Amino acid sequence: MNRNFANFDYLLFLSVLALSVIGVLFIYSSGVNSDGILTSFEFQRQIIWVCTGIVLLFLVALYDYNKVKEYSVIIYAVGLLLLLYTPFFGKTVKGAKSWIGFGSFGIQPSEFMKIAYILFLAFYLDRSQKETELKRFIRAGVITLVPMFLILLQPDLGTASVYVPIFLVMCYVAGVKLQYLAFIFLVMFLGVAGLLYPMWEFYVTKEVSSLSRVLTDTRFSLLLFGVFFTVTALFLIGYFVFRKKYYYWLTFSFLILCGAMLICIAGLKVLKPYQMKRLIVFLDPSIDALDSGWNINQSMIAIGAGGLRGTRFLQGTQSHYKFLPEQPTDFIFSILSEEWGFIGGMIVFSLYIMIFRRIRKAALRCSDFYGKLVCIGMQVIFMYHFMINIGMVMGIMPVMGIPLLFLSYGGSSLWSAMISIGIVMGINLRQI
């Protein structure tokens, strides 16, 4: 280890540290009211979480990731057990039962499950390189769907959505055929479109079509799924009997429709009305002007008010007059943009870009396939959180409850982010 300690990534660590300090500053700012009085002490907890998170980062970095590889199945299984426990015995926070607690202490298992999932998926994709691509794709899909389903039961749509890009990117790097990945993408796209289309007609156009009635009626949806499934089975039989290529593509196409219908049916059962509304409110904030639409409008006002240089630290109006809800968590970038302006936003952007580049460099330097896949999975987590959260506060992405890692208030998200960075740094340390 000593001879490889020269591989310690100071730029990555300093970028993480800088973002964490900025996060504490603006969590403090969010707790100050219009009279300049500190009314919330969340920043003190965040300082403790940052300090303990840094300790976790170094402990994980110093532990040999190759040893973790052998226990990845156990780590994944423990994560699933915690996810199973949470919906029945967990705490309900903001409509989702995603916390388990002991007294005043609580953690969010779904945040740590992302790490367990990446470790196990990387382990499987590394060990299965001699298997057929279809078998690898199906098994990797099952590994992904199980935690996604358990997280949706909480229900926590934002965290569940993170698994899709991780799965697609890691499978692509592992050499899974593009047509299989295109299948997943199209199923997700059509499934989500099938969920949103009726909501769009109901809240925006005020005209409900026959298609929307079918998609929102469970009986009709199940009937339509049965029709698609029967047609898929017939085309599949035709392919095996006649070995014609067009039967293969017809089977592929109708299988996509079957998958999309399953997402629509499951979405109607699992997602609550306020979550469905959040998925379309960014297109027209007036749909839900007093809830999700209010958040988006106030966030954009705060960002616009900051201008180039901002209103100065602790001088923002949207935050200190409490116009902006969820200030220290989902919308912390709005406070930062108001008080530090465009320049402050660019500083944060630069720090995140540095993190992305350093993780990518660690992946490229890695000599073993398992470590490379783990680094890539971690990079996807950070990029997805960054893009969705920034898009959300700017009104160009749906409100999904995705925190801005290292900045947003919260111990579980911060600790999981620190552990993820620790894993990447540990992989980088052990390269020759």
Positions of PLM-derived features:
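Flexible extramembrane loops and terminal tails that flank transmembrane helices
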Residues: 1-15
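Hydrophobic alpha-helical transmembrane segments of multi-pass inner membrane proteins, especially
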Residues: 13-29, 33-291, 334-394, 419, ...
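TM-adjacent membrane-interface loops and short helices in multi-pass inner/ER membrane proteins
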Residues: 281-332, 340-344
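Helix-boundary and loop/linker segments of multi-pass membrane transporters
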Residues: 4-6, 136-137, 321-324, 366-367
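A short, flexible N-terminal coil/short beta segment enriched in small residues
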Residues: 6, 20, 299
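Transmembrane helix boundary and interhelical junction motifs in multipass membrane proteins
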Residues: 156-161, 311-316, 327-329, 400, ...
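Short pre-catalytic strand/loop immediately N-terminal to key active-site residues, enriched for Gly-Thr
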Residues: 103, 320, 405
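A juxtamembrane structural motif centered on a specific transmembrane helix
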Residues: 1, 388-432
